[in-house]
Amino acid sequence: MTKQRLLFITTGGTIASVRTQQGLKPVLTSEELLAHLPELKELCCPETLALCSIDSTDLGQEHWLMMARAIQENYALYDGFIICHGTDTLAYSAAALSYLIQNADKPIILTGAQQPISNEITDAKKNLRDSVVCAIDPGSRGVMVVFGGHVIAGTRAKKNKTISYDAFASVNFPELALVQGDRLVRYISSPWPTGPVEFSRVLDPKVFLLKLTPGMSPALIPEIFRLYDCVIVESFGVGGIPQQLMDAFAAGLGDYCLLYTSPSPRDS
């Protein structure tokens, strides 16, 4: 059987870091990263593309567009894509790519690690291997997060642990699959695309997430409306908003885009 061609896109993060006097620094090249796992060549034909080498806390919308563009430019050349990413903003990137890349009929996987791949004890090697196992499965397609053996839809991943290897959970949706050794145990089939793959090259950077807290000053609202095109309000419970804030929203709303969501990770 012909091995699938997978493109590993590296962005930095803990997985590609080494310890320095200033702390962890993402300095490993994409080739150096994969050199720690030569056995991957038994499962696939891996190739690499270094997109950037930064801490994921510095990664934002311009990098999401870079990732989407890199996948678009190489889409016809590879059977799947694995993005090596820092864990702090990995879920944001997965969600963004889920909307930037529509109707993907190939797997686009984001993974990372809680410990650098150069460490004697690390989860990086398992996460990379698990990502390959998922990517070469014929039923895998679309944007996913593979971490700690769990396969999570790109729009549902949330980092809920800062140290444990089991760092990500699926919010309000079942996990797609579980990786057990070299076997993928699928719980939910990935939907078939409804049309040809589509790539977007436009993002509105002026979207703000406003988390309500007791006693928040309504004086903040006009300034937020001035700076942003859309505000997502993380309200209390199932939509509770203090009356003072509600009045401030109503006063400046007009044609403004205002969305409400719940802070509850379950049943929302």
Question: Where are the regions that the model predicts?
Answer:
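Short beta-strand segments
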Residues: 9-11, 83-85, 109-112, 144-148, ...
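ATP/NTP phosphate-donor binding region
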Residues: 1-73, 247
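A short helix->loop->beta-strand "cap" motif at the edges of active sites that frequently abuts
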Residues: 105-106, 254-258
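Conserved small/polar residues in nucleotide/adenosyl-binding loops
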Residues: 260-267
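Short Gly/Thr/Asp-enriched flexible loops that form oxyanion-binding sites at enzyme active sites
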Residues: 84-106, 241-249
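Accessory alpha-helical/coil subdomains and C-terminal extensions
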Residues: 9-10, 36-37, 153-238
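Internal gly/pro-rich beta-alpha loop/helix module
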Residues: 110-179
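Short acidic, glycine-rich surface-loop motifs adjacent to enzyme active sites
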Residues: 78-90, 227-237
